[in-house]
Structures are given as structure tokens and as C-alpha cells.
Amino acid sequence: MVYESSASSRCAAGPKIAAIGGGTGLSTMLRGLKKYTDRLTAIVTVADDGGGSGVLRREMGILPPGDVRQCMQALANTEPVMEQLLGYRFPEGQLKGQSFGNLLLAALNGMAGSFEEAVSMMGQVLAISGRVLPVTNADVQLEAVFENGARVVGESHIFNAKKQQDCRIHHVSLVPEHPKALPDALEAISEADLILLGPGSLYTSVIPNLLVDGVADTIRASHAQKFYICNIMTQDGETEGYTAADHLEALQRHGREGIVDLCLANNAPIPRGLAARYSEEDAELLRIDRERIAELGIALAEYPLLSAQGGYARHDPALLAQAVMELYRERTVRIYRGTQQYITEEQEWK
């Protein structure tokens, strides 16, 4: 059974969804989900300190706009040229590498006096479906602790540090610790019918949200369905050698048991040539270790979700949104502690 989107099914009748993460992964999913519901809230990490966002953060004292801007682009209901404009990066000069969308958000921040209000204003300008919220208004940095005890502060430094240490990340934390969550973000989570974590970089886009005071507690206390959208590939400098169960264990290590009920994973193969290119970058198709996932008491749903367009292995926005909404609508996942139910696209649910 397929959950088709339509003008009548999209709007107030759609479910309340809280999508938590950051970066390209979250924005990709939002592009698909906005066709099913307007009651969609993206809750976005603000720990980024690299690239154009890092420059604006250091020079203007604002929260990093990049991840928020990507989500805004995904949810925008404007002319295609406007979306292209938001993503445009200056090729030279003092603004080299900076995106117009980041600068627009920085300008709105100056007008509004707060990042939260600037994000709200940008949402109005772009007529977005749903809303985008920073998870916190606090100025935070991400600290990673490796299995050998070494530490590094700053999201942009984690990749090189992991290469130098040549071991896995044990855990991450925020500096300073225990920043307060945006009240609207906690409200969106508590009122959601469906809570989605990911897709996106595990330690630098997804987990940082769980470290903000109240976020993990509110997720666990919710009676909503809670899905983790597993990445298509492992990530060089962050999750080399990881399986789907490794991702889930990391989520539980940072957010405790009960943070997620179901893992949605891709089961489509990657084209051989693309796999070879990713292998050169120490990345591979994420392996689904079903027995370990079952031992964690988390349900597993497998769907073909891969898009290989443009030479990258990413989620197809339409396929991902369809899978999420189909699972939600049919309520085929039965949640029992310690019980595993396998779900594939070919099954007919009643």
C-alpha cells in the first residue's frame, strides 16, 4: 500500500512531525516530507564552526546559519531562482565560499536582534511549509572524546583529529554543557505525532541535538512514533566501519534507551563504479546487522531509498518521504521491548 501525497492530504490534516538533525541529510528529507504535511518542524543543530557558517559565527557573533539555511531552502515555496539564489556561493573576493542565504540570514539577525526571530522572518520571506527552529539559542561548541581518551573541541576539527587518533569516537558533548533548549523546540517534540532523527552526520548533526537540555528527555517521554533514518553510507572521519546497529548504540549512549523505536534503512545496492569511488574515500554502503538491531529492541524497516544522481549516494527525497509516511500511516510497527519485527517493502500490511 502506498501513501500518495495530494493537495487534500497535505495541510492541516497531515501529521505533526518533528524532524531533528542538520546538514544535507535533514534538508533532503524535508524536501519530500513537505508534500505530505504542513505541520512539520525542523529542529536544527547549531554546533557548526566551519566553512562560511564558521566565518559569520566568529566575525558577527551569530549562531551558525548554514544548516538552518539548508532546511529553509528545502521547505521554501518560492520560484526556483530564489532557491538557487539562497544556495549561491561567491566564487572570489572576501566573500569567497560564502552563500547568499547565509548572508541573508545574518542580515535578518541584525534587523531582528535574535537568531530565533531572524529564522522566523526568513521563513515568512520564503513562505516555507512548516517551520525551522534552532535547537538552542546558546553559543555552543562540540567536543569529541575518542576511545583512546584524546579530546578535541570544535566540529570542524573532529575529522582531522579522528584521522590522527585512528580510533573511534566514544562520545561527544557540548561546551558549555547543558545549554537550554528553545521552548518552541521542546513543544514541537512533545506535540509531535512522529519524531524523526536524521538522516545526517551521526556525531556532528544528529547527536548534538540530544545533548541540549530537555531534548532527549522530551523525546523519550513522548508517545509519538520515533524513527531513526539511517544513513546510506558510512562517513569518512566520523563513522568508518560503522553498521546500522553501531549508529543506534551511539544514539542510546547519548540519549539513553527509548530514544528511538524504529530504524529505517536503505536496502538498495550502490552502483559498482560509485562504490569504488566511495571506497577511495574510506566510505562504504552501511551494513544492516539485523540480529544486533533486534537485540537492542528496535524495530527495523528496510526500503530502497538510494539516489545515485550527481555521483553521490544519498537518500531520494520522494522515496524516503513515502517510506516514512507509509510506515506512520499504516502503524505497522508494533513496539514491544525486546521484540523485533522485520518490515520490507514487499509485505502487504493489514
Model feature map: region roles:
Residues 24-30, 199, 204-211:
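Short glycine/serine/threonine-rich phosphate/pyrophosphate-binding segments
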Residues 37-38, 222-226, 260, 298:
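A short helix->loop->beta-strand "cap" motif at the edges of active sites that frequently abuts
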Residues 138-199, 203:
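Active-site gating loop/helix substructures
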Residues 2-62, 66:
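Gly/lys/ser-thr-rich phosphate-binding loops in alpha/beta enzymes
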Residues 41-47, 225-232, 261-268:
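Short internal beta-strands
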